[in-house]
Amino acid sequence: MKQTTLFLTATLLGQALVSGESVTVDSQADWEKAIASSTGVAVENGTVSPMGKTGQLKTKLKRFDRKRSALSLTIRQSAVWQNWNPIENLGPANLRDAPVLLTVGPGNYWMFGRYGNNKPKAKRGEQAKRLAKFTPQEAKLEGFDMPLQTTRFPNQYNAPGGLNPGKGGYHAWQSRDMKNWVHHGPVTEGFSRWVTSAEWVDGKAYIYYDFPNDQDPHVYVDDNLFDGLPGKNMGIAVEDPSHGSDAGFIRDLDGNMHVIIEDWGAINASKRSWDSPVAGHAVSPNGLNGFKFQKPAVDNRTKPTGKIATYRHPHWAKEDPKRFKTNIAEYEVHEPEQEAYGDWAAICIGGQYYLFGDYDPIGGHKMSVGWFTSPSIDQPFTWCDKIGNGHPDPDIAFAEGQFYLATQQQTDYVSPGPWVEKVTARVGVDTSNDGKIDLWTNWIEVKESYDYIKGFSKQVKRVPAALDLSKFPDGYAFQVELKIADSTDNKSKPIIESLELTFE
């Protein structure tokens, strides 16, 4: 475990820092104006972070001309979200293809994928071995009041709907704890097997799929995920002017449905793992139709050459010959070589949006999960980082108080959230107007926490990292001290982005 500790003293009363009813440091200029002395810290890109194991920082002292009543100290960290830890394959052992996650509420988590039987693969020149005979037994599982049967897979059970025959598409599993999974049967059919995303709208699951593969998103509306039958097929939802799809859907707090979609108009996607430098963005009031395209969420195209070239897709004309007479598509050649992303998944934490997807770097290097962030889904997203190896086709969900990043590889990931521990704070007050601190609070660890928002699967409440000062004495000056300890085993570290001291 890394034990990097930073001691940071910030007197938030420097010149040009007082504005209205708060004192704020939140930009490069603010930090530079506020700092009186520092050792062992880097102040860059509007943040403060440790250069080594320890560091110190003091800001210029400035006193108020009258007593003020402090309410709280709030600390905000960088949104880069590198605080991920690997875990063994998440979800049912026999879930196949790209996993799709859906959080309905506390203790009500769903995972969708194709149903595999885990039949042993045959060695070359040999016949495949048969699965050992298995006799299901009646079972009970906390949180499930329906009849259950054991399965040949550990921590997995069949509900009545799970005994229905498959239809060649995706199946549904439900969990109360992200450890034990109950199979409820098929939710899509063979032609709709290219499921990319799911959302929760007014008590119904919206299950989105490409038809044909890598083309216009279609949608099922399922008001009963327990019956082992697909819901109502509403047909095409997004008429995509480009090729690519592999779309992720997210509903905003106003109820609008947003889609983030691959756009292959500037790349030979067949040579780049069917990914693209462009992520299109469209929005609909109902998630069923009427999607209007906006500016791209991600646009990392290089220079267009004006040359038009073609590539071939293996599925279009075969799967939907009525709408697609050919498998050949055009694209405009761009130079130099471009990064490519895709298989999008989205989540929003306290208004900060994140896009997770495939990351296929230039030069033929290994694929991984990459992610972007933006303070608004209507603004361009900026690159954060990457993790893992292999073609991920990821999805993300908030469950059991933490965040799960599922991939189609053997390794998945879990995170407590974008906040990186450990930050301990105390505040001092000058009550006598002599420029010296008369009283300090105790040292208190502060950190963000996260919670569900009723009725929303991918919108997560952020509770800020704050110190309550409402019972603190009034004063002419206030001083803040922070201790920051990097307690993670991953590459993340606490990066302080802003401090805000608020007053009555």
Walk through the language-model features, giving the residues of each.
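Positively charged n-region of N-terminal signal peptides that target proteins for export
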Residues: M1-T4
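Surface loops at the rim/top face of extracytoplasmic beta-rich domains
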Residues: D214-P217, D223, D254, V259-N286, ...
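Entry beta-strands of beta-propeller and related beta-repeat scaffolds
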Residues: P106-M111, G203-I207, G255-V259, Q352-L355, ...
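Surface loop/turn signatures of beta-propeller and other carbohydrate-active proteins
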Residues: T24, Q28-K33, S37-R63, V80-G105, ...
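Short glycine/acidic-enriched loop and turn motifs that connect beta-strands
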Residues: G116-K121, P212-Q215, W264-A269, D360-G364, ...
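Non-cytosolic beta-sandwich-type ligand-binding/adhesion modules
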Residues: E21-P86, Q127, A172-S175, H218-N224, ...
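Bacterial N-terminal signal peptides
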Residues: F7-A16
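Loop/turn-rich, solvent-exposed surfaces of beta-rich toroidal or solenoidal domains
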Residues: R323-T373, T407-V420
